A protein has these predicted regions:
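Short beta-alpha junctions and helix-cap segments that line functional grooves
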Residues: 134-137
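A generic structural micro-feature
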Residues: 139-143
C-alpha cells in the first residue's frame, strides 16, 4: 500500500516538473533605471558636459545638458551631487588641477543660477588624473575635457 502511494506521489511530482507553464512574476517589472539614481541621470539627462581646449566657459551644448540637470535636481530634491572637473593630458599637473576646478565651478554656478541650492553641490578637480577616454589624440582629448556630475 505504501509503495502504491509513494509511486503515485512520485508520478505526480514528475508530471508537475514537466509542466510547460512559465513561472509568473508577482513583482513589478523594471523597465529602466531606478528613478532619481545615477543611472537615471545618465540615461535621461546626461551626466557630463564638455569644454574647449584650455577653456572653462560653458559651450551651448553644455548649457542644454546643465538645464536638464537643473530640472532633474529640482525634481529629485533629496539628491546631492558632486561635479568633477577634468582635463586632457596636455599641460602641467598644477595647471590642469586649477583648470579642472574652474570647469567644475562653472557647471556648479550654472546649476545654482537655475535654482539648485549650492549646499547640494560639491566640486572637485582631478585635472588629468582620471581620463574617461584613453589615447593621445584629439578625439580622446576632447572627451577628457569635461565636468561629470555624480549623485551622492
Amino acid at each position: 500500500m505504501n509503495i502504491k502511494i509513494l509511486g503515485t506521489v512520485a508520478a505526480v511530482a514528475l508530471l508537475a516538473a514537466c509542466s510547460n507553464q512559465a513561472a509568473t512574476s508577482t513583482g513589478p517589472v523594471s523597465s529602466g533605471p531606478v528613478p532619481g539614481s545615477q543611472e537615471d541621470l545618465v540615461a535621461n539627462v546626461g551626466d557630463r558636459v564638455f569644454f574647449d581646449l584650455n577653456k572653462n566657459a560653458l559651450r551651448s551644448d553644455a548649457r542644454i545638458t546643465l538645464e536638464r540637470q537643473a530640472a532633474w535636481l529640482q525634481k529629485w530634491s533629496a539628491n546631492n551631487v558632486q561635479i568633477a572637473g577634468n582635463c586632457d593630458e596636455r599641460g602641467t599637473q598644477a595647471y590642469n588641477i586649477a583648470l579642472g576646478q574652474r570647469r567644475a565651478n562653472a557647471a556648479r554656478d550654472f546649476l545654482v543660477a537655475k535654482g539648485v541650492a549650492a549646499t547640494r553641490i560639491t566640486t572637485i578637480s582631478y585635472g588629468k588624473d582620471r581620463p574617461t577616454a584613453l589615447g593621445s589624440n584629439e578625439l580622446a582629448w576632447a572627451q577628457n575635457r569635461n565636468a561629470i556630475t555624480s549623485v551622492r
